[in-house]
A protein has these predicted regions:
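Arg/Lys-rich, alpha-helical DNA-contact motif
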Residues: 1-116
């Protein structure tokens, strides 16, 4: 899940078609900093997965402001992972494992909060 997968390069037009979203929806995700294109204007496999997931959440009433909350939370978690990896010689090997552990913790905490 946390290995870098840039095997797909989609243009904006291709992303809109494959993800089955309109320009306004995609622009909202970009404004919320959920996704951004590369310097060449292309999108990756992960971008496609993010757009599709956001579209599914939108079907339940989530909107761009909510997606920004998710982005901010993910950025804070990423900062914690980077801090833990700072100065480690094995950071490349440990990084994916540490990210997976924090994702599991996040999921379990969310489950606990929804149960309470």
């Amino acid at each position: 899940m946390f290995e870098r997968r840039d095997d797909l390069r989609l243009s904006r037009k291709e992303l809109l078609k494959v993800a089955e979203v309109d320009e306004q929806f995609l622009a909202g995700l970009e404004d919320a900093k959920v996704i951004s294109s590369s310097r060449s204007g292309h999108f990756t496999t992960d971008d496609l997965a993010l757009v599709k997931t956001a579209r599914e959440l939108a079907d339940f009433g989530f909107h761009a402001a909510a997606f920004r909350v998710f982005r901010n939370a993910a950025d804070r978690e990423a900062d914690l992972v980077r801090q833990a990896l700072s100065g480690r010689r094995d950071s490349d090997e440990v990084g994916a494992e540490l990210a997976a552990l924090t994702a599991r913790l996040h999921g379990l905490l969310l489950k606990s909060s929804l149960r309470d």
